[in-house]
């Protein structure tokens, strides 16, 4: 972690699963400060209390900033003194983005442009933008906006001065907030059949730790304008569901197929 010694890292959308994973890994290192930039004060308060309870000796390294990536002025307000940025703020639920596509544009596209504009103005050293495999040959609003986010990052990298801008592209991050595995676990605990959309649907999968590793790899090895994609194992949703049943005592015969959601890929 010597590259982070005494440095200030800002994580946009930092109260999510990725932000928590970064804090768990970084707080006990020699990093100077981690800024959590997000719009939900309740999630910030929950995170503050959680880390004060679990890591009281280093919790004061976390600084919380209320703001929204859609608002350039609020992004600028959190930027002074920042050395590095992990840009994780996004709308990522496929059906939500499908029903409200302009909301996805405002967060995933305009929000990214705002973060990069403010970072370049402030002379931030490095920005890593988190994207998704759904940006490849996109068929839904979420994938389309994340593909444009990548284009925005590449375009900004051509005029970024000393600021290095890279993107990483993820598969499905297991057990992240809003993903299907926590839903299945809750359904099993409640004694209900687990629901899946389409058994033959295939997804690339990775753990939260692998997600953090990919961002760190991009941070350490990426060149300005790069898009880094990790090779990841793939499996069907049926296989995932059966594995969760085995681990948590669910019944495979109770798996209930509910059909593909709006905008989903096979």
What are these regions (language model features)?
Residues 38, 65-66, 106, 198, ...:
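Conserved residues in the N-terminal Rossmann fold of short-chain dehydrogenase/reductase
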Residues 126, 152-202, 226-227, 253-258:
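Conserved beta-loop-beta element that borders a ligand/cofactor-binding pocket
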Residues 7-29:
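N-terminal Rossmann NAD(P)H-binding glycine-rich loop of SDR-like oxidoreductase domains
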Residues 84-87, 91-151, 155, 165:
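Conserved Rossmann-fold NAD(P)-dependent oxidoreductase catalytic core, especially the SDR/UDP-sugar
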Residues 221-266:
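Mid/C-terminal beta-alpha module of Rossmann-like enzyme folds, strongest
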Residues 63-84:
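Conserved Rossmann-fold cofactor-binding substructure of NAD(P)-dependent oxidoreductases
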Residues 30-46:
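Conserved glycine-rich Rossmann-like NAD(P)H-binding loop of the short-chain dehydrogenase/reductase
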Residues 114, 175-183, 197-217, 235-244:
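Substrate-positioning beta->alpha
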């Amino acid at each position: 972690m010597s590259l982070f010694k005494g440095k200030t890292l800002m994580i946009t959308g930092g109260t999510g699963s990725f932000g928590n994973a970064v804090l768990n890994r970084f707080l006990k290192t020699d990093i100077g400060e981690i800024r959590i930039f997000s719009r939900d004060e309740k999630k910030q308060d929950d995170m503050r209390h959680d880390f004060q309870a679990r890591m009281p000796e280093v919790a004061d390294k976390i600084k919380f900033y209320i703001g929204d990536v859609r608002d350039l002025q609020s992004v600028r307000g959190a930027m002074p003194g920042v050395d590095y940025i992990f840009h994780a703020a996004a709308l990522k639920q496929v059906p939500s983005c499908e029903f409200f596509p302009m909301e996805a544009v405002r967060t995933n596209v305009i929000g990214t442009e705002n973060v990069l504009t403010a970072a370049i103005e402030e002379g931030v050293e490095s920005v890593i933008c988190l994207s998704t495999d759904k940006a490849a040959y996109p068929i839904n609003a979420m994938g389309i906006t994340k593909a444009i986010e990548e284009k925005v990052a590449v375009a900004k990298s051509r005029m970024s001065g000393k600021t290095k801008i890279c993107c990483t592209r993820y598969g499905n991050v297991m057990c992240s907030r809003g993903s299907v595995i926590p839903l299945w676990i809750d359904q099993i605990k409640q004694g209900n059949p687990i629901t899946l959309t389409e058994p033959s649907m295939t997804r690339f999968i990775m753990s939260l730790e692998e997600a953090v590793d990919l961002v760190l790899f991009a941070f350490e090895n990426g060149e300005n304008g790069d898009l880094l994609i990790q090779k990841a194992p793939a499996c069907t949703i049926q296989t995932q569901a059966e594995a969760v049943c085995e681990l948590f005592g669910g019944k495979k015969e109770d798996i209930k197929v509910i059909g593909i959601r709006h905008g989903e890929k096979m």
